[in-house]
Regions:
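Hydrophobic/basic alpha-helical segments enriched in Actinobacteria
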Residues: 15-16, 24-27, 33, 121-128, ...
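Short alpha-helical linear motifs
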Residues: 79, 149-153, 190-197
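C-terminal effector-binding regulatory domain of bacterial HTH transcription factors
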Residues: 1-2, 212-236
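Short helix-capping and inter-helix turn/linker motifs at the boundaries of alpha-helical repeat units
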Residues: 10, 102, 143, 193-194
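A short secondary-structure junction motif
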Residues: 22, 26, 81, 175-183, ...
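Short linear motifs at protein or domain termini
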Residues: 1-107, 113, 117, 235-236
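Conserved amphipathic alpha-helical segments that form helical-bundle/coiled-coil interaction surfaces
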Residues: 104-182, 199-205, 214-226
């Protein structure tokens, strides 16, 4: 029989843990509904307000989906909650753009090699298509280029075949949107900006050819260039 949660401090947090345990014990998958709020409260031995607070907390973490009057459902995990945590950690600890790039480099040197070995034909084709669209957007504002750049790196992580890598790379999206323009402005000439896109094209071409070594070399060149232009612009 389930033991009721009676400790006053941290009731909602304990209820959140109890709901997570229930999800695993019942083998619930993304999209599956949870028991009603009343049933959950009885199962956990807490009040309905505590249960409601726990459900909201799990929804914020993207563990649950709560929409309107529907029952809470198990959510398909995404990087949104982790992205907020990373953004706060970067701000609160005063981390530099260079430090963020160092972490991204470590992750993406691995994802690009795996993507070259595991990518689908559709993923490889889309990567090349993104680079073509980046060239086309070069004459316009940087907003389109930023979104294409973010999509490019996200797709490589997805093509690695490892969902954790995909979530980790995607979790940088808030930071990337805040800092992307700084890096772009640091590429002061049209040719330098075009060279940056050419590097993306080399990455995509290597992934299409399933050449992991060449893909890793191109990704290393990409991050070397990013670090270099920021240093020249005085960004540390």
């Amino acid at each position: 029989m389930t033991q009721p949660i009676t400790s006053e401090p941290g009731l909602a947090e304990m209820a959140m843990n109890g709901i997570r345990d229930l999800i695993r014990a019942q083998g619930l998958r993304p999209g599956d509904p949870l028991p009603s709020e009343t049933a959950l409260a009885a199962h956990l031995g807490v009040s309905r307000p505590v249960t409601r607070e726990a459900l909201r907390g799990l929804a914020t973490l993207r563990i649950l989906d709560i929409g309107g009057s529907r029952k809470a459902r198990v959510a398909l995990p995404d990087a949104s909650a982790l992205s907020l945590v990373l953004d706060h950690a970067t701000y609160s600890r005063g981390m530099s753009i260079q430090q963020v790039l160092d972490v991204r480099r470590t992750l993406e040197m691995r994802t690009v090699g795996l993507a070259a070995m595991r990518r689908s034909d559709a993923e490889a084709t889309e990567l090349l298509d993104i680079t073509a669209r980046m060239f086309a957007a070069l004459e316009g504002g940087h907003t389109d280029l930023m979104e294409l750049d973010i999509r490019f790196h996200s797709l490589i992580a997805k093509a690695s075949g490892n969902h954790l890598y995909a979530m980790l790379v995607d979790s940088f999206w808030i930071i990337t949107r805040q800092t992307w323009a700084i890096g772009w402005r640091s590429r002061a000439t049209h040719q330098n900006r075009r060279d940056n896109i050419k590097c993306h094209e080399r990455i995509a071409t290597a992934i299409m050819a399933q050449d992991a070594s060449r893909a890793e070399a191109a990704m290393s060149e990409h991050f070397d260039s990013a670090v270099s232009v920021l240093l020249r612009a005085g960004v540390t």
